[in-house]
Curated annotation (Swiss-Prot):
One of its GO terms (molecular function) is DNA-binding transcription activator activity, RNA polymerase II-specific. Residues 46-145, 194-318 are annotated as: Disordered. It comes from Homo sapiens (Human). A motif (OAR) lies at residues 323-336. This is Retinal homeobox protein Rx. Belongs to the paired homeobox family. Bicoid subfamily. GO terms for biological process: camera-type eye development; hypothalamus development; limb development; pattern specification process; positive regulation of transcription by RNA polymerase II; regulation of transcription by RNA polymerase II; visual perception. Disulfide bonds: none annotated. A motif (Octapeptide motif) lies at residues 33-40. It is linked to Microphthalmia, syndromic 16: An autosomal recessive disorder of eye formation, ranging from small size of a single eye to complete bilateral absence of ocular tissues. Ocular abnormalities like opacities of the cornea and lens, scaring of the retina and choroid, and other abnormalities may also be present. Some patients exhibit developmental delay and intellectual disability or autism.
Length: 346
């Protein structure tokens, strides 16, 4: 952008107020619109005289430097002529251009804090973040016998001691309060495991399968042909009998008894060398059942036993838990022998 009237002033190589004046359309010079007038400079200021000379000298020097640094285009050598010597190196410029920073090591810091971070430093930071952090492993505490004894005594008093009790106990056993707290947590977990094991073992002992195996099985009496349980044998009403071992129906007792598994006539079920036992006491004899007679009622809870019978069959042996299988077989055979004769008479 050129202002009118500035060309003569630039040719003289100096700035003058007349060259930069913007005159009004009327031709009056009352108002000045030059840069020097706006900034408040006048002709008497020294800066106006020195600025154009310095600017011209600097521009000429820059032009000389650019012309000297530009290499000349080499000409193609003619045939048969010797190669021309290499051109002389260009003179070094007065200042060097800034070069990019190249760190020797990836973790080397940049000397200038104002410059941006290079890619090598960023890669080093990423590699450090990718490395897994080492897991902090706490050393295991080894307790002495005295410490364990005192801790167990405190655990018997209270499973959940407060912070004051823990601090007092920690000072007594020479341990940190945190270690005492962790010990109580582990001890409570161990105590809960022991309680669960005890409860599970008690449930297994009280299960019906184990209680059934302890009591004598009632199925062992079936092949022995145990008779009706109303009259009672030597064991009386203490032995629990099955429902099919009840008193026979009138008129069909022998048939129902022979239809049971493992039961037959006394002569066939017993060997020939078997000697019948002595007759049972009088109160054990059951009257023959006629067609019009009803089955006997259950016996009374107690019987007047003689001294000989009490010595032979004590009350302790009547308990099925104390009696053995051999004793039960012998009692069943005696009972069959006792009630077999009246049924044969029918």
């Amino acid at each position: 952008m050129h202002l009118p009237g500035c060309a003569p002033a630039m040719a003289d190589g100096s700035f003058s107020l007349a060259g930069h004046l913007l005159r009004s359309p009327g031709g009056s010079t009352s108002r000045l619109h030059s840069i020097e007038a706006i900034l408040g400079f006048t002709k008497d200021d020294g800066i106006l005289g020195t600025f154009p000379a310095e600017r011209g000298a600097r521009g000429a020097k820059e032009r000389d430097r650019r012309l000297g640094a530009r290499p000349a285009c080499p000409k193609a050598p003619e045939e048969g002529s010797e190669p021309s010597p290499p051109p002389a190196p260009a003179p070094a410029p007065e200042y060097e251009a800034p070069r990019p920073y190249c760190p020797k090591e990836p973790g080397e810091a940049r000397p200038s804090p104002g410059l941006p971070v290079g890619p090598a430093t960023g890669e080093a930071k990423l590699s450090e973040e990718e490395q897994p952090k080492k897991k902090h492993r706490r050393n295991r505490t080894t307790f002495t016998t005295y410490q364990l004894h005192e801790l167990e005594r405190a655990f018997e008093k209270s499973h959940y001691p407060d912070v004051y009790s823990r601090e007092e106990l920690a000072g007594k056993v020479n341990l940190p309060e945190v270690r005492v707290q962790v010990w109580f947590q582990n001890r409570r977990a161990k105590w809960r495991r022991q309680e669960k094991l005890e409860v599970s073992s008690m449930k297994l002992q009280d299960s019906p399968l184990l209680s059934f195996s302890r009591s004598p099985p009632s199925a062992t009496l079936s092949p022995l042909g145990a008779g009706p349980g109303s009259g009672g044998g030597p064991a009386g009403g203490a032995l629990p009998l099955e429902s099919w071992l009840g008193p026979p129906l009138p008129g069909g007792g022998a048939t129902a008894l022979q239809s049971l598994p493992g039961f037959g006539p006394p002569a066939q079920s017993l060997p020939a060398s078997y000697t019948p036992p002595p007759p049972p006491p009088p109160f054990l004899n059951s009257p023959p059942l006629g067609p019009g007679l009803q089955p006997l009622a259950p016996p009374p809870p107690s019987y007047p036993c003689g001294p000989g019978f009490g010595d032979k069959f004590p009350l302790d042996e009547a308990d099925p838990r104390n009696s053995s299988i051999a004793a039960l077989r012998l009692k069943a055979k005696e009972h069959i022998q006792a009630i077999g004769k009246p049924w044969q008479a029918l």
